[in-house]
From Swiss-Prot, chain A:
Gene this protein is translated from: RAB4B
Membrane topology of this protein: Lipid-anchor
Lipidation (S-geranylgeranyl cysteine): 211, 213
Listed EC numbers: 3.6.5.2
Cofactor(s) for this UniProt protein: Mg(2+)
Keywords annotated in UniProt: Acetylation, Cell membrane, Endosome, GTP-binding, Hydrolase, Lipoprotein, Magnesium, Membrane, Metal-binding, Methylation, Nucleotide-binding, Phosphoprotein, Prenylation, Protein transport, Transport
Subunit structure: Interacts (GTP-bound form) with RUFY1; the interaction allows endosomal tethering and fusion.
Residues bound to Mg(2+): 22, 40, 63
Entry protein name: Ras-related protein Rab-4B
Protein origin, superkingdom: Eukaryota
Activity regulation information from UniProt: Regulated by guanine nucleotide exchange factors (GEFs) which promote the exchange of bound GDP for free GTP. Regulated by GTPase activating proteins (GAPs) which increase the GTP hydrolysis activity. Inhibited by GDP dissociation inhibitors (GDIs).
Catalytic activity entry: GTP + H2O = GDP + phosphate + H(+)
Membrane spanning stretches: none
Length: 213, 585
């Protein structure tokens, strides 16, 4: 039960409805395609410990609902996310067109420094493609995103997407660009002792005051 | 304790006030407070005491000091108690709205915990006038409905039938709903046909899908196909008004053309759906020949719109008002195009177009419907596909009902989660009209939980108060962990009436109790089920010192593993607890 890891990163999976967010997460966690996936309501959840550049990192991944109507709800989960997979469906231009709005949400609500990787999912459906690789990579470049085309069905590039994002965050920590200590950085140190450090503080608060007056 | 406190209260308040006319012993105690010397003998070093403390302990009568301390302690306790009582009474006033004050017990008359059985139900059906509605509901509340008769009982619980209706009245209710369903189905299917037609023209060949955004053609295509809000920017090409192809040659799946005649006069006109055509990128015409008439059409339509498809219950007015009646709103072409003067010939063609368009829908409506159909299709396909009932034909029925409901509520539109709520109804009732009617009834309550409905925040606030009153230990823990007083971990619970938290068989059992509870114990029974879920795992939550994230994760993982009957039992007990609390105030 007890996991040891050096860091914990909070990740988001965001993007329009039906782009395969839950399937990407499921593929990453379980290494298989989720056949009977239902649309996500509220938020779903997954975590996995990965090894990146000699460090063990626990990814705590929040999988969100896609329909815009739920955006106000989804937003409450954004806070303190270190990384995000921004997902669109390569066979649906509509999902590609709304990327900018999702990105704005992520940068304003999670953190301006959030590390985002753009994922053009459903790569296996190439004959039905509506968005070219070139067009999307241009968008990624303009918005300073990493970019991969993925397939939750075959598993192609799924692991890479998560790992790439994690690696970038680690690099930014190493270079000092990201400060894990800052509130809402979405990064926590993994050792259990640190988590317990938080407890005595609240214990002190309820301890009786020394003076009765 | 209370009487003692209140008799002493005068003194306490005086002490807290520290007015200028203090008696001598008060002054002395004030002195001791001012220098905080009560602890100086124990806290600071003995050498420091005389110099820093003005009141040397041995000069003060020890008894007086103790007295003062005692009073202060009692005062603090009293004020704490008073605040707590005030808080409690506020919460009680608040909570009293959550439950029915009259307690209906399971054991009087006995047997309610056995549930509503087939026997009882057949007795009721033979003698519906003399059976007490409340008695039946009480049995449902305490024991559920026998599976075999759910199909018959649910329409009563949901309000499609009323208890005490005669057979004839029930038939009347059925035929009214059947007629309405048939009409609505015809209405939106006619509209769907136009939407599909429009889509076909917007995407004539697969390769035109690649739009770089640079050419006007693709720009137009994008506007037509994707944009659901800016209807005034949609271009219409007059030159595309060719006679429609016969349906047989179309490559798409056959449209339900035969349905068209079934609708009321307003929809029958949709048989001329093909008249609305849009510029397509491969029309081969220079884009200069496109001109915008949409705004003109729009405004004419708005004027000619007095006749809508009002429902008898007034539920669908917003949604259906977009439909254009076949009135001659366009008998005179309006000066809609800014380029009128220079394009006389086109205006002529425009007049022709307008004449044909009388029978059509507003662009806005078409866009909205297209968007909703798209969303519904996406979700219906993946709705409960691991449950045996949802074979492709049954999914198609689910879609028809869903679209019909959405057509009548286009102002809200389809929201994810609606499918989840409809699916169990269809499974039990296995009848399209009935499921449609019952779903409409169910949504009267449930629609408020959806975004912008406002009920969700109220649920969260109520949960907070309930936990505070019924489980203060857990409340303290939650309070310490800060974040999850927002109770977002209950979001899905409330949105879907626990549908995703439970196995299908348990969903049936829980839902009918929720519906019956409304008349028996609480209109907000869902709150108590939510609370029961929290309580069922309270030790785990407490012992692991779970925070918001842990709790969301925990309950996501526990989904479909709950013991529904146990949860219901706890929930009923919690209602009873609150009822007792209120009674004993």
């Amino acid at each position: 039960m007890a996991e040891t890891y050096d860091f914990l990163f909070k990740f988001l999976v965001i993007g329009s409805a039906g782009t395969g967010k839950s399937c990407l997460l499921h593929q990453f966690i379980e290494n298989k395609f989720k056949q009977d996936s239902n649309h996500t309501i509220g938020v779903e959840f997954g975590s996995r410990v990965v090894n990146v550049g000699g460090k063990t990192v626990k990814l705590q991944i929040w999988d969100t609902a896609g329909q815009e109507r739920f955006r106000s709800v989804t937003r409450s989960y954004y806070r303190g996310a270190a990384g995000a997979l921004l997902v669109y469906d390569i066979t649906s231009r509509e999902t590609y067109n709304s990327l900018a709005a999702w990105l704005t949400d992520a940068r304003t609500l999670a953190s301006p420094n959030i590390v985002v990787i753009l994922c053009g999912n459903k790569k296996d459906l190439d004959p039905e493609r509506e968005v070219t690789f070139l067009e999307a990579s241009r968008f990624a470049q303009e918005n300073e995103l990493m970019f991969l085309e993925t397939s939750a069905l075959t598993g192609e590039n799924v692991e890479e997407a998560f790992l790439k994002c994690a690696r970038t965050i680690l690099n930014k920590i190493d270079s000092g660009e990201l400060d894990p200590e800052r509130m809402g950085s979405g990064i926590q140190y993994g050792d259990a002792s640190l988590r317990q450090l938080r407890q005595p503080r609240s214990a002190q608060a309820v301890a009786p005051q020394p003076c009765g007056c | 304790m209370a009487p003692f406190l209140s008799s002493d209260a005068g003194d306490m308040i005086e002490m807290q006030g520290f007015g200028p006319s203090l008696p001598a012993w008060h002054l002395e105690s004030l002195c001791s407070q001012g220098s905080s010397c009560l602890f100086c003998s124990t806290r600071s070093s003995p050498y420091a005491t005389p110099s820093r403390c003005s009141c040397v302990p041995d000069r003060l009568p020890l008894r007086l000091l103790c007295e003062s301390m005692k009073r202060q302690i009692v005062a603090r306790a009293f004020y704490g108690w008073l605040a707590y009582c005030r808080h409690l009474s506020t919460v009680r006033t608040h909570l009293s709205a959550l439950v029915r004050h009259h307690i209906i017990p399971p054991a009087r008359p006995p047997g309610a915990s056995g549930g509503l059985t087939k026997d009882v139900w057949s007795k009721y059906q033979k003698d519906e006038k003399n059976y007490k509605e409340l008695e039946l509901l009480r049995q449902v509340y305490y024991g559920g409905v026998e599976h075999e008769i759910r199909k018959d009982v649910w329409p009563f619980l949901l309000g499609h039938y009323k208890f005490g209706m005669s057979k004839k009245e029930m038939e009347q209710a059925d035929s009214a709903v059947a007629a309405r369903y048939k009409r609505v189905l015809a209405e939106w299917k006619a509209c769907e046909a136009v939407v599909r037609q429009r889509e076909r023209e917007a995407q004539p060949a697969p390769f035109t899908k690649f739009s770089s955004g640079s050419s006007i053609d693709s720009h137009v295509q994008r506007l037509v196909h994707r944009d659901s809000t800016i209807s005034n920017d949609v271009f219409i090409s007059v030159d595309d008004l060719e006679p429609p192809e016969p349906p047989g040659t179309e490559d798409c799946r056959p449209e339900p053309e035969q349905e068209l005649g079934a609708g009321p006069p307003g929809t029958a006109v949709a048989g001329r759906q093909q008249s609305v055509e849009f510029d397509s990128p491969d029309s081969g015409l220079p884009s200069s020949r496109n001109y915008s008439v949409t705004s003109g059409i729009q405004s004419s339509i708005d004027e000619g719109q007095s006749m809508g498809f009002e429902e008898e219950d007034g539920g669908g007015e917003e949604g259906s008002s977009g439909l254009v009646p076949a009135a001659g709103a366009f008998s005179e072409p309006r000066d809609a195009s800014p380029h009128k003067a220079s394009r006389a010939s086109e205006l002529e063609a425009g007049a022709e177009l307008v004449a044909v368009c009388t029978a059509a829908y507003t662009i806005e409506l078409l866009d909205t419907m297209a968007l909703n159909l798209h969303r519904i299709d996406k979700d219906v396909q993946r709705c409960d596909r691991n449950y045996w009932y949802f074979t492709p034909p049954n999914l198609e029925r689910l879609r028809d009902i869903m679209c019909s409901y959405v057509w009548e509520h286009l102002d809200v539109g389809y929201v994810q989660g609606m499918c989840d709520l409809l699916a169990p109804l269809l499974v039990i009732l296995d009848n399209d009209q009935l499921a449609y009617s019952c779903f409409s009834h169910l949504m009267k309550r449930m629609s408020q939980n959806f975004p912008n409905g406002g009920a969700m925040d109220t649920h969260f606030a109520n949960m907070r108060s309930l936990i505070q009153i019924l489980d203060s230990e857990l409340f303290e823990l939650m309070h310490q962990n800060g974040d999850y007083t927002h109770f977002y971990f209950c979001y899905r619970w409330f949105l879907l009436d626990f549908k995703r938290e439970l196995l299908y068989e348990d969903v049936f059992a829980v839902w009918e109790v929720i519906w019956a509870a409304r008349h028996i114990s609480s209109e907000h029974f869902v709150l108590f089920i939510a609370l029961a879920l929290v309580e069922a795992y309270r030790e785990i939550i407490r012992d692991n010192n779970m925070d918001f994230t842990d709790i969301i994760k925990f309950f996501n993982e526990r989904a479909e593993h709950h013991d529904a009957q146990e949860i219901l039992q706890i929930a009923r007990e919690l209602v009873h607890k609150v009822q007792m609390l209120i009674e004993n105030k």
